[in-house]
UniProtKB/Swiss-Prot annotation:
Organism listed in the record: Mus musculus
Catalysis: reaction(s): cytidine(32) in tRNA(Thr) + S-adenosyl-L-methionine = N(3)-methylcytidine(32) in tRNA(Thr) + S-adenosyl-L-homocysteine + H(+); cytidine(32) in tRNA(Arg)(CCU) + S-adenosyl-L-methionine = N(3)-methylcytidine(32) in tRNA(Arg)(CCU) + S-adenosyl-L-homocysteine + H(+)
Annotated localization: Cytoplasm
Protein name from the UniProt record: tRNA N(3)-cytidine methyltransferase METTL2
Keyword field: Cytoplasm, Methyltransferase, S-adenosyl-L-methionine, Transferase, tRNA processing
A single BP term in Gene Ontology: tRNA methylation
Binding-site residues, S-adenosyl-L-methionine: 78, 82, 181, 206, 232-233, 253
Family label: Belongs to the methyltransferase superfamily. METL family.
UniProt subunit comment: Monomer. Interacts with DALRD3.
Domain of life where this protein originates: Eukaryota
Amino acid sequence: MAASFPEGVPETEDGKRPQFGHRFLSDPARVFHHNAWDNVKWSEEQAAAAERKVQENSSPLVCPEKQVDYEVNAHKYWDDFYRIHENGFFKDRHWLFTEFPELAPSHSHLTGVPLEKQRSDVCEDGPGLTAEQHKCSCASPGCETQVPPLEEPVTQKLGHLEISGEEFPGSSATYRILEVGCGVGNTVFPILQTNNNPNLFVYCCDFSATAIELLKTNSQYDPSRCYAFVHDLCDEDQSYPVPEDSLDVIVLIFVLSAIVPDKMQKAISKLSRLLKPGGVMLLRDYGRYDMAQLRFKKGQCLSGNFYVRGDGTRVYFFTQGELDTLFTAAGLEKVQNLVDRRLQVNRGKQLTMYRVWIQCKYSKPLALRSSQHVPIPHATESSSHSGLL
């Protein structure tokens, strides 16, 4: 029986659900006929209004003492988030397999995943902000490529352990995936459900010990196929439980935006060293002028395009150029760097919501070359909408 696709979503020759970007709003009168529309173009007036809104909510900045608190106690804010929401806040990301087929390397097509779950209706926003939670006591204004494993054992230190290329969790696997910022498993468990290849192994880590505890107590967690651990992406002294040049895929889904911009480059460069030559790094995150950015109020801005939510967690809004700089400075090559401009619709309340996400795929060269370190543009760079909107 042929697959049934929603109106406006064309079926491809092989019957697969197409990637995002195939449902266009040609008639504004039909805006409430679907829940989402792809590649929605902004008018010059709308882009200018978004830029004005960001300029307005970018000052005053959160005072220095509160900024230090949000950085030093970042893990506590995420622990609190997961204690409150447990595993009920984010939906399982079944749409990832359509956008990133590297996560299901043995599948030429998806089976058993309903179309509505494959559809990338992404919503990853934290709770809203309240000015009261940010008051300061100070006076300051506030392609799927796989390379055979290396034959020579690689020895590294992992915290207090010494591991070799032949003795680490999942060392016998031939295809290894690491998700950074895994939360309670909304990406990991769909990957494990979709892949029944015994030679595939998944690693997953999160800043929050509470999130990892919840993930490990989930009935779907299988230590023979998955290794979950607590890890601070920004801590240069912490090691990963795998040697360099050992991973096929690294996944970053709405996680890089949660760390201080000045620490992003070192984090990506460190992750890059874990990839095999030919391995890929996959990212989906917030784009500049996303609805979530425009909704922030005065007093919640930490620095240019970097904000704190009401629960103390933080979020940065990227441009394509910033992400390209991060990845290429880490020695990776661009495969994909796309803006997903989505118009989401609440048909019940007759509301329209303009979303901006960026989706990237960068690969590690097969022929390794020495690369110079290029610093990330400072977070206070101009919030020009050129190249994004």
